[in-house]
Amino acid sequence: MISALSFFLRIFNLATPKGLVFDEVYYVDGARDFLKYGVEMNNNAPEFVVHPPVGKWLIAAGIKLFGNHEFGWRIAAAIAGSLTIYLAARIAMRIFMDSRWTTLTALLMALDGLNLVMSRTALLDIFLTLFILLAVNSWLAGRYLNFAVFLGLAMGSKWSALYFVILLLLLELVLNRNLIRVIKIGVTSGAIYIFSWIGWFTSNNGWDRKVKSNPISSLIYYHKEMLGFHTGLTEKHSYQANPWSWLVMGRPTSFYYQSPAGCGAKTCSQEVLAIGTPILWWIGAIALIFLIGVNLHNFAMRELDFAVLIPLVGVVAGYLPWFFFQKRTVFTFYAIVFEPFLILAIVLLAKFAYEYDAKFKYLIGLAVVLIALNFLYFYPIFTGQIISYNAWSARMWWSSWI
């Protein structure tokens, strides 16, 4: 029910704002090229692109089904974002085994502004998040073939999935001590990743397609170029944000800003700000500290609790690696991939508090109400509604949000 209602929020007025928003200019263009050429082109010449094709193929599917317009560009992201809410709840049920905490997980996912914004924008990160959650859910269910396939699709969306692949396979090896299974999963996920480049293999127009004597060698050469781009990306951007600031939403990314007429005031504002619901994320920062402490205690006691371990694994894989790229240009919205696991950490904190003293249910309820009100307050700048400049300015709590 929560996922269904969230889907409505994601598709309602999905064509707003008009035109290409932020990096949609790259990914929608790439999706159009896939439909026309099978690969990405620039003025009828091969185009150097730095992300794998899966997410762009999903955007292309939306365009094919619904048309080459804003709704068609964004519908795949809206579906993916709605599914992340459902999948986070499924994972919560597997690790908490209690419908109350499952419901709370789904509700908090639905009340996160970052998830809403990313679900209404044709970028790749929401697809990465979807496949990571599908992989984790499959792993917890013991469906190892699905686990491998979804890991491959995650890597085929964005390379940052590799951190999840490494950590999850190491965890599988440590917990089950089955090296053969881990190798099979790794090989299968790698094969799925390579297969995701099928458009490049079957076309003579792909970038570096014929730079070497055979397609595999050419793809390896191309990947070296992609790696060079990613490791050398240090160009300054007005909305780049150090990972230290992500949890508190210190520098959210403005995807769109205009000053149109139509709000009834002298000056109007229309913005799409990729920011998490502030109160939710601030509680998440506290919950992460708690989560680390509980895991350290369990490690010292040699205890294993998936309800404690899974949220930490997700946050570590999705968040920690970015601290090692202090000179690289990065953005707060990259946090969407570990957002479900941060919410699981919040739910874990609520669960511990309630089990310690049932009276904490009143505090938990109050926190949910405050998060919901915070979400509603920021809703206009999550969805690009036209509001007065004063109303917009009132929502810029920190100067770094402008």
Task: Report each predicted region and the residues it spans.
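Short acidic/glycine- and proline-prone juxtamembrane loop motifs at membrane-interface regions
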Residues: L20-V21, A77, L114-D125
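Aromatic-rich transmembrane-lumenal/periplasmic boundary elements in polytopic membrane proteins
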Residues: T16-Y37, I185, S189-M249, I387-M396
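Transmembrane-helix motifs of polytopic, lipid-linked glycan transferases
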Residues: A4, F71, I75-F96, L134, ...
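Transmembrane-helix signature of polytopic, membrane-embedded enzymes
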Residues: I2, I79, A88-L111, Y144-N146
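Short helix- or helix-capping micro-motifs
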Residues: I2-S6, T105-A110, N137, L151, ...
